[in-house]
Amino acid sequence: MADYSSLTVVQLKDLLTKRNLSVGGLKNELVQRLIKDDEESKGESEVSPQEQNQEQGSEPAAIEEPASQNITEKKEVSSEPKETNEPKEENKDVQKPSDGPSATASENEQAAASTAAPALSPEEIKAKALDLLNKKLHRANKFGQDQADIDSLQRQINRVEKFGVDLNSKLAEELGLVSRKNEPESGNNGKFKNRNKNANNRSRVSKNRRGNRSGYRR
């Protein structure tokens, strides 16, 4: 044991501060405090080898217990997913679509939607109409058609450029935007037919008159 009484108060306080002990009091109190601390530390270090072996032997047992617990926990966790997979298989059976009229009806609707022609925008219709009219105008100028027809085509081009295509017009029918209507016979056609009928009637009357005249002469 060190001779603390030969040390100064400053040295004793330094030792006490290093050991985290109180530095208050007289020199004798400081010396007694250091001696007591040495005895306590010596008593802790004097542990029998048998006690150390017992402590070391008990530690692996304590360590082995958590290992066995981890193994059992892993087994329980691995068994849980099997239970959760069963409802998924049941859901697969439930989600299978049933074959029937509804399935065929939806397929027919999809096929009809895919085959339907896309609707043209007004600008696309205008471009298509101008292309057709310009071709007609070029053809009319090339083959020397009447100036009235050429002027009519030019007016149609100007009208389409300003107002677009009228869906009720003949031009819309030529472009295939609307179905062709069964137009009734115009008044001129009726007049021509009536004229033909009248001409046929006159020819019959004249033939009858000629026949009668020839009979009188005989």
UniProtKB/Swiss-Prot annotation:
Any one biological process term the GO annotation gives: transcription elongation by RNA polymerase II
Biased composition (Low complexity): 102-122, 186-203
Start-end of Basic and acidic residues biased regions: 72-96
Superkingdom field: Eukaryota
Composition skew (Polar residues), residue ranges: 47-57
Pfam families: SAP (PF02037), Tho1_MOS11_C (PF18592)
GO molecular function (one): double-stranded DNA binding
Keyword Phosphoprotein listed: yes
Domain SAP: 4-38
GO CC terms of this entry: nucleus
Free-text function comment from the UniProt entry: Facilitates RNA binding of SUB2 and likely plays a role in mRNA export. Suppressor of the transcriptional defect of HPR1 by overexpression.
Family: Belongs to the SAP domain-containing ribonucleoprotein family.
Miscellaneous information on this protein: Present with 6580 molecules/cell in log phase SD medium.
Subunit (UniProt): Interacts with SUB2 in the presence of RNA; this interaction facilitates RNA binding of SUB2.
Name of the featured protein: Protein THO1
